[in-house]
C-alpha cells in the first residue's frame, strides 16, 4: 500500500473515531499541556520530522519527494518556528511515525540523503546543529531544483578526498622533478643509449635500402622510395612512442589522478551548459528546439511550484487562525471538534488537494509534451516533405537540362559533321577534277614524246640513205675528172681509213642528236612528274642534291647566321628565366639521403650539342627565357629545335613546346617587350623548324624573350633543346 493510501486510511479512521471523542476543550488543553512538557530537543526533532512531510512540491515522476524539504522548511523558517503551530505539527508527526519505518519510505530517504536532501533524517542523529544546517542549505535555494553538485552526489568527504588526491599528485610530481635534478646521469645515459641504438639501426637500414633501390628500375624505385619514406616516418613515430612509454614510469603517472579528477570536476560543472555552447547547425536544430521547449516547461513548473508554495503559506496561515479560533472557542466552553480531529481533517484535505494538483499537473504536462512532440513531428515531416520535393524538382530539372544538352550537342555535332563533310567533299571533288585534267595533259605529252621517239629510227635511216646516195656520185665525179685531179687521190688503204673516220663521225653525230633528244624528253617528263608529285631524278641530280645537303649541313643545317649562339657571344639572362625542373635523380647520396641533383641550366638552349636529354626543362607547360644576342639585329626569323620522335625512348615528344611567342626588348631592365610574333611547333614535322616574322618593317633589338605558352601534353615539365635567332645586322 502506498503512503498516500495509508494516510487516507488513517485519516478516515480518525474521523470515525472523532465522533465519539470527548469535548474539544479538554482534549486541546490536554494535548497542549503534553506537548509543552516535552524537552526542546524532542520538540525540534518532531518539528523536523513533521516539516519533512508538510508540503511536497509538485514534480513529475517518482522524484517529486526529493524537493519536498525546500518548500516545507522554507515555510517553517519564515512562519512557524517558535509559533503555536509547532504544537500541531508535533501531533501530526506522532501520527506519521509508523510511515517512516517502512522499507519504501526509508529507501526514498536514502536516495534523498545521497542527493543532499535528507537533512531531516540526519538531524535525528546529530541534533539541532544538523537540523539548522539542513534548513540553511535548503533555504538558500531559489528555484526548487537542486544544484549540479547535489544531483551528482558530491559531499564534503568527496571534496576532501579529491583535494587529498591533488596534494598527493603534486607531491609525486615534485619528487619526480627532484629526481631529475639530483640524478641527471641516469636519465641522460638512458637517453644517449636510446638515441645511439636508434641512429645505428636507422643508418644501417637506410644503407641497405639505398643499395636495394638503386638496383631496381626507375619507376619501381620511385614507388619504393615513397613507401620507404613513409615506413621511416612510421618507424620514427614508433620510436618516439616507445621512448615516451619507456620514461612513463619515472614520474609521468603521478600527474594522471590529478588530471583525471580535475577534468571530471570540470566536465561535471560544464555539463548543464553544453547545449548552450554548441553551434546551431542544421543537424542539431531539432534537438535544440526540443531542449529549449523542455527548459521553458521547467521554468513554467518552477513558477507553478512558487505559486503553490505561496498558496500553501496562505492556507497554513488561515489554518493557524482557524486553530486559534477553535482553541479560543474550546476555552470558552463551547462544544466543537477536538484538536486532533481538526488536524486529521485538514491534513486529509491538504493531501487530497495535493494529489489532485499533482494529477492535474501531470495530465497538463503530459498533454503539453504530447502537443509539443506532435508539433515537432509535424514540422519535421513538413520539412522532410519540402526537402524531398525540392530534391525531386532539382533532379527533374537536372535531368531535363542534361537531356536538352544532349539533344543540342547531337544537333550541333550532326550539323558540324554535315558542314565539314560537304566542305571536304567539295575540296576532294575539286582536287579530283584538277588531277584528271593534269593526267589528260600528261597523257597527251607522253603520246607526243612517244611519237617523236618512234620517228627517230626513220630519221636515222633517211640520213644514211642520203649519205649513201651522195657518195657514189662523188666517187664517179672524182674518177671521171682529169689526171691532175686523180694524182691528188689517196691510196686504197687511206681511202678506207678516211671512210671509217667519216662513218665514226656520222655515228657520233647521230648519237649526240639521239642523246640530246632523249635528255630533252627526260627533262620535260621529269618536270611534268615533279609537278604531279612523282620525283624521278638522274644520277647527276642525285649528286647535286647530296652536295647541296652536305653543304647545308656544314652551314648549321639551315644556312642562316645564329645570333643566339653562346660561342658567338650570346648569353642567357638567368635572373629572368623560369624555374628549372629538378629530375629528383640524385647523383650523390649518403645513406639514401640525396645530396646533389643534376639539372641543366638555360644555357643549353644556346649550344649546338643536341641529343636526347641534353635540354633545359622548366616546370609546367608555361615558361620563358630571356636571351641577350651577340649583336643588335633586325630579326627576320627564329628557329626552334627538338629531338625527333625516332630518338625518343617512348616514341613521343609530349614535352616539346607547342604554342610560343617572341618578344623584343630595347634594354635588359625593360619589363614588357614588343610582341614580334606567335607561332606553333609541329611535333609531327621536322625536328628543326624555322618561323619567319610577317612584319615588313622590324625594329632592331639585342634582347629577345622566348615565351612558351603550351606544350604537347606533358603535365610536369617542358623541354627546349635549341633556340636560334636570325636577322640582319643593325649597321
Swiss-Prot record:
Segments of skewed composition (Low complexity): 18-33
InterPro entries the record matches: SUN1-5, Sun_CC2, SUN_dom
GO (cellular component) term, any one: condensed nuclear chromosome
Record field: transmembrane: 227-247
Annotated consequence of substituting residue 432 to A: Disrupts homotrimerization; disrupts interaction with SYNE2
Top-level taxon: Eukaryota
Nuclear side: 1-226
UniProt GO molecular function: cytoskeleton-nuclear membrane anchor activity; identical protein binding; lamin binding
Record PTM text: The disulfide bond with SYNE2 is required for stability of the SUN2:SYNE2/KASH2 LINC complex under tensile forces though not required for the interaction. The disulfide bond is proposed to be conserved in LINC complexes involved in force transmission.
Membrane topology: Single-pass type II membrane protein
Gene3D superfamilies listed in its UniProt record: Galactose-binding domain-like (2.60.120.260)
SUN domain sequence ranges: 569-730
Chain intervals for the UniProt region annotation (LMNA-binding): 1-128
CDD domains associated with the record: SUN2_cc1
UniProt-annotated glycosylation sites, renumbered to this chain: 650
Residues on Perinuclear space side: 248-731
Tissue spec. comment: Highly expressed in heart, placenta and muscle.
Coiled-coil ranges (or none): 396-452, 486-519
Main location, first listed in the record: nucleus
Annotated region (Disordered), positions in chain: 1-69, 106-142
Residue list for modification Phosphothreonine: 117
Metal-binding is among the record's keywords: no
Function per UniProt: As a component of the LINC (LInker of Nucleoskeleton and Cytoskeleton) complex, involved in the connection between the nuclear lamina and the cytoskeleton. The nucleocytoplasmic interactions established by the LINC complex play an important role in the transmission of mechanical forces across the nuclear envelope and in nuclear movement and positioning. Specifically, SYNE2 and SUN2 assemble in arrays of transmembrane actin-associated nuclear (TAN) lines which are bound to F-actin cables and couple the nucleus to retrograde actin flow during actin-dependent nuclear movement.
Comment on protein domains: The proximal coiled coil domain mediates trimerization required for binding to nesprins. The distal coiled coil domain is proposed to dynamically regulate the oligomeric state by locking the SUN domain in an inactive confirmation. The coiled coil domains are proposed to be involved in load-bearing and force transmission from the cytoskeleton.
Known partners and oligomeric status: Core component of the LINC complex which is composed of inner nuclear membrane SUN domain-containing proteins coupled to outer nuclear membrane KASH domain-containing nesprins. SUN and KASH domain-containing proteins seem to bind each other promiscuously; however, differentially expression of LINC complex constituents is giving rise to specific assemblies. At least SUN1/2-containing core LINC complexes are proposed to be hexameric composed of three protomers of each KASH and SUN domain-containing protein.
Protein's recorded name: SUN domain-containing protein 2
Taxonomic source organism: Mus musculus (Mouse)
Annotated gene: Sun2
Amino acid at each position: 500500500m502506498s503512503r498516500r493510501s495509508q494516510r487516507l486510511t488513517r485519516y478516515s479512521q480518525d474521523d470515525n473515531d472523532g465522533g465519539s471523542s470527548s469535548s474539544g476543550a479538554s482534549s486541546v488543553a490536554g494535548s497542549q499541556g503534553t506537548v509543552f512538557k516535552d524537552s526542546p530537543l524532542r520538540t525540534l526533532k518532531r518539528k523536523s520530522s513533521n516539516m519533512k512531510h508538510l508540503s511536497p512540491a509538485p514534480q513529475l515522476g517518482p522524484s517529486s519527494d526529493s524537493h519536498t524539504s525546500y518548500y516545507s522548511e522554507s515555510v517553517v523558517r519564515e512562519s512557524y518556528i517558535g509559533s503555536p503551530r509547532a504544537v500541531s505539527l508535533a501531533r501530526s508527526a506522532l501520527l506519521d511515525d509508523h510511515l517512516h519505518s517502512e522499507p519504501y519510505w526509508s529507501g526514498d530517504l536514502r536516495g534523498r540523503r545521497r542527493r543532499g536532501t535528507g537533512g531531516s533524517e540526519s538531524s535525528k542523529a546529530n541534533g539541532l546543529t544538523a537540523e539548522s544546517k539542513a534548513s540553511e542549505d535548503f533555504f538558500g535555494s531559489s528555484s526548487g531544483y537542486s544544484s549540479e553538485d547535489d544531483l551528482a552526489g558530491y559531499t564534503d568527504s568527496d571534496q576532501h578526498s579529491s583535494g587529498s588526491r591533488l596534494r598527493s599528485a603534486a607531491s609525486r610530481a615534485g619528487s619526480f622533478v627532484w629526481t631529475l635534478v639530483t640524478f641527471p646521469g641516469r636519465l641522460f645515459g638512458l637517453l644517449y643509449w636510446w638515441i645511439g641504438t636508434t641512429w645505428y639501426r636507422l643508418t644501417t637500414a637506410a644503407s641497405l635500402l639505398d643499395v636495394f633501390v638503386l638496383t631496381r628500375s626507375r619507376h619501381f624505385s620511385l614507388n619504393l622510395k615513397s613507401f620507404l619514406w613513409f615506413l621511416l616516418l612510421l618507424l620514427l613515430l614508433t620510436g618516439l612512442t616507445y621512448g615516451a612509454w619507456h620514461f612513463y614510469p619515472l614520474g609521468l603517472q603521478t600527474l594522471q589522478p590529478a588530471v583525471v579528477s580535475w577534468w571530471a570536476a570540470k566536465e561535471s560543472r560544464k555539463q548543464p551548459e553544453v547545449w548552450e555552447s554548441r553551434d546551431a547547425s542544421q543537424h542539431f536544430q531539432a534537438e535544440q528546439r526540443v531542449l529549449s521547449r523542455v527548459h521553458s516547461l521547467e521554468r513554467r513548473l518552477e513558477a507553478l511550484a512558487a505559486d503553490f508554495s505561496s498558496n500553501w503559506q496562505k492556507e497554513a496561515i488561515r489554518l493557524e487562525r482557524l486553530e486559534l479560533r477553535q482553541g479560543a472557542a474550546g476555552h470558552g466552553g463551547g462544544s466543537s471538534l477536538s484538536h486532533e480531529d481538526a488536524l486529521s481533517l485538514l491534513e486529509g484535505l491538504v493531501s487530497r488537494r495535493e494529489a489532485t494538483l499533482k494529477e492535474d499537473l501531470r495530465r497538463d504536462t503530459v498533454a503539453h509534451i504530447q502537443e509539443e512532440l506532435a508539433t515537432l513531428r509535424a514540422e519535421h515531416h513538413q520539412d522532410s516533405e519540402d526537402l524531398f520535393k525540392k530534391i525531386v524538382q532539382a533532379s527533374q530539372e537536372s535531368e531535363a537540362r542534361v537531356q536538352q544538352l544532349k539533344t543540342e550537342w547531337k544537333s550541333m555535332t550532326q550539323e558540324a559533321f554535315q558542314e565539314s563533310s560537304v566542305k571536304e567533299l567539295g575540296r576532294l571533288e575539286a582536287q579530283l577534277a584538277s588531277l584528271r585534267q593534269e593526267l589528260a595533259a600528261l597523257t597527251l605529252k607522253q603520246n607526243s614524246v612517244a611519237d617523236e621517239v618512234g620517228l627517230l629510227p626513220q630519221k636515222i635511216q633517211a640520213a644514211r640513205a642520203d649519205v649513201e646516195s651522195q657518195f657514189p656520185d662523188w666517187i664517179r665525179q672524182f674518177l671521171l675528172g682529169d689526171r691532175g685531179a686523180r694524182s691528188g687521190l689517196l691510196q686504197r688503204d687511206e681511202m678506207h681509213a678516211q671512210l671509217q673516220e667519216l662513218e665514226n663521225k656520222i655515228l657520233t653525230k647521230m648519237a649526240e642528236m639521239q642523246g640530246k633528244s632523249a635528255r630533252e624528253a627526260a627533262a620535260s617528263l621529269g618536270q611534268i612528274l615533279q609537278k604531279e608529285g612523282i620525283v624521278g631524278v638522274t644520277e647527276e641530280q642525285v649528286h647535286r642534291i647530296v652536295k647541296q645537303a652536305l653543304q647545308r649541313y656544314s652551314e648549321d643545317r639551315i644556312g642562316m647566321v645564329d645570333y643566339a649562339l653562346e660561342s658567338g657571344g650570346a648569353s642567357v639572362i638567368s635572373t629572368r628565366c623560369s624555374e628549372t625542373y629538378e629530375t629528383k635523380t640524385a647523383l650523390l647520396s649518403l645513406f639514401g639521403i640525396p645530396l646533389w641533383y643534376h639539372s641543366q641550366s638555360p644555357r643549353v638552349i644556346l649550344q649546338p650539342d643536341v641529343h636526347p636529354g641534353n635540354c633545359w626543362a622548366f616546370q609546367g607547360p608555361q615558361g620563358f627565357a630571356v636571351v641577350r644576342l651577340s649583336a643588335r639585329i633586325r630579326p627576320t626569323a627564329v628557329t626552334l629545335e627538338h629531338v625527333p620522335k625516332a630518338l625518343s625512348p617512348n616514341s613521343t615528344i609530349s614535352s616539346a613546346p607547342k604554342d610560343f611567342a617572341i618578344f623584343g626588348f630595347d634594354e635588359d631592365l625593360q619589363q614588357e617587350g614588343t610582341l614580334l610574333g606567335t607561332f606553333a611547333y609541329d611535333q609531327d614535322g621536322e625536328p628543326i623548324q624555322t618561323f619567319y616574322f610577317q612584319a615588313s618593317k622590324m625594329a632592331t633589338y639585342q634582347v629577345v624573350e622566348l615565351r612558351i605558352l603550351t606544350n604537347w601534353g606533358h603535365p610536369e615539365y617542358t623541354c627546349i633543346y635549341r633556340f636560334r635567332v636570325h636577322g640582319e645586322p643593325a649597321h
